[in-house]
Design a protein with these regions (language model features):
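Active-site signature of alpha/beta-hydrolase-fold catalytic machinery across serine-
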Residues: 28-32
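Conserved alpha/beta-hydrolase fold motif
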Residues: 16-17, 39
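The feature captures the conserved acid-bearing segment of alpha/beta-hydrolase catalytic domains
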Residues: 46-121, 126-128
Length: 169
């Protein structure tokens, strides 16, 4: 996270894009660096919650996932920036014997709780489950799947809705 902070200071205002295990350091960086003006995260693997509001651990065959407590003062920073999370296909709603599926099942469940927590505290977080909007076939490496241009267009539309791609006066 210190390296992300140094990079943030060097490049200035930016939108942070994270993937998988990079999601957790992304949340930490966004909480610590005012230069982070938004976060787009592809299937993040870890999540932060305000102290006293960490949901119960979600167990699964791969060990499950637990939220990480942070002071409310830090968490509130996530409520001040737009955040979007994308999750791909092949993620079951019920426990699976396929370890990869199971790993992302519990993380998607925790992502839902994370987005709900941010929005409950006045934030602007969105969770996009691609199959629910008619986009199928994505693996965990969404950005390199055959429909990566379609996913890039989704991100572009979000950036425009957040006014990141328009000149600010």
């Amino acid at each position: 996270v210190p390296a992300l902070g140094a990079l943030a200071e060097r490049i200035g205002d930016h939108i942070l894009v994270t993937h998988s295990a990079g999601g957790f350091p992304g949340w930490m960086s966004a909480m610590q660096n005012s230069e982070v003006k938004g976060v787009a995260s592809y299937e993040p693997g870890g999540f932060v919650f305000p102290e006293g509001e960490v949901p119960d651990r979600i167990d699964g065959l791969t060990g499950g996932v637990a939220g990480t407590a942070v002071p409310m003062e830090q968490f509130k920073r996530l409520t001040e920036i737009p955040i979007i999370l994308y999750f791909g296909d092949y993620i079951p709603e019920t426990p699976s014997k396929n370890l990869g599926d199971e790993n992302w099942r519990v993380r998607l469940q925790m992502a839902r709780k994370f987005v709900e927590a941010i929005n409950r505290h006045g934030g602007n977080a969105t969770l996009v489950e691609l199959p629910k909007i008619g986009i199928y076939g994505n693996t965990h490496f969404l950005m390199q799947d055959l429909n990566n241009a379609e996913l890039a267009n989704l991100l572009d539309k979000w950036l425009n809705r957040q006014r990141f791609l328009t000149k600010q006066k």
